Regions:
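Hydrophobic beta-strand anchors of alpha/beta hydrolase catalytic cores
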Residues: 87-88, 114, 159
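Thiol/disulfide oxidoreductase modules built on the thioredoxin-like
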Residues: 131-137, 142-190
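Alpha/beta-hydrolase fold active-site loops
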Residues: 85-86, 111, 167
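Conserved redox-active cysteine motifs that mediate thiol-disulfide chemistry
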Residues: 82, 86, 90-107
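Structural microenvironment flanking redox-active thiols in thiol-disulfide oxidoreductases
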Residues: 99-133, 144-150
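N-terminal targeting signals for export/organelle localization
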Residues: 1-65, 181-184, 191
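A short beta-strand-turn-helix
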Residues: 55-61, 65-86
Length: 191
C-alpha cells in the first residue's frame, strides 16, 4: 500500500471515529451539543458497575504513548503515572453520563489516582467546569485532539484501569458510581 493510500485512509477514518465518539455518548442533554451538561440534585447517580460491563480482553496491554495536556497545560503521556495504579476516565462537559459520574470519580480519587481526561476542544471550557464544580481531588487533563478516544475507539464516558506497571487491567464504557462497593472492588484489582 502506498503512503498516499495510507494517508487517504487515515484522513477518512478519523472523522468516522470522531462521529462514533459523539454518537456513543448518551448525552441526555438538550440544546446545543457542545453546551456544558450540569448535574442536578434530582439527577440519578450513575449506576454501579456491572461485571458484564467490564471488558478484560485487553488485560496486559501497555498504556498508549499518546500525548495530551496535563493540568499545567504542558504535554504529557500516561507514562507519567507509571509506578502507581491509575484510573483513566475519558469524558466531556457536553456528555450527560460523564458529568453525572464526575463527583463519584472525585470521591474515588481519595483511594486511587484518577486521570479525568477531557475530550473537549479547549482548556477554558474544562477549567471553568472544574472551578464551578469545586472538585477536591480531580485535576483538569485535556485531550483536545481526542487522540485517546481515537486510540480506544471510545464512546464516552470510558474508563480504563492501569496497574502500577502501566498495563491495562480492564476497561468500561458508560457512567458508573465509583463510590459503590463493586466499583471499589474493581479498582482494588490494580496493584
Amino acid at each position: 500500500m502506498s503512503a498516499s493510500t495510507i494517508s487517504s485512509f487515515r484522513s477518512a477514518i478519523v472523522p468516522v471515529l470522531l462521529l462514533g465518539l459523539v454518537a456513543g455518548c448518551d448525552k441526555q442533554v438538550s440544546g446545543n451539543r457542545q453546551a456544558e451538561a450540569t448535574p442536578t440534585a434530582s439527577a440519578p447517580v450513575a449506576a454501579a458497575p456491572k461485571a458484564d460491563k467490564i471488558d478484560r480482553t485487553h488485560k496486559g496491554d501497555p498504556a498508549p504513548s499518546v500525548s495530551f495536556e496535563g493540568p499545567d497545560g504542558k504535554p504529557m503521556t500516561l507514562a507519567r503515572f507509571k509506578g502507581k495504579p491509575v484510573l483513566v476516565n475519558l469524558w466531556a462537559t457536553w456528555c450527560g453520563p460523564c458529568v453525572k459520574e464526575m463527583p463519584t470519580l472525585d470521591a474515588a480519587a481519595a483511594d486511587i489516582t484518577v486521570a479525568a481526561i477531557s475530550q473537549d476542544k479547549d482548556r477554558p471550557t474544562i477549567d471553568a467546569y472544574f472551578a464551578k464544580n469545586g472538585f477536591q481531588r480531580l485535576k483538569p487533563y485535556l485531550d483536545k485532539n481526542v487522540a485517546l478516544s481515537v486510540t480506544y475507539e471510545a464512546s464516552l464516558p470510558m474508563s480504563i484501569l492501569f496497574d502500577s506497571t502501566g498495563h491495562e487491567v480492564w476497561r468500561s464504557t458508560g457512567g458508573m458510581d465509583w463510590t459503590s462497593a463493586e466499583a471499589k472492588a474493581l479498582l482494588a484489582e490494580a496493584k
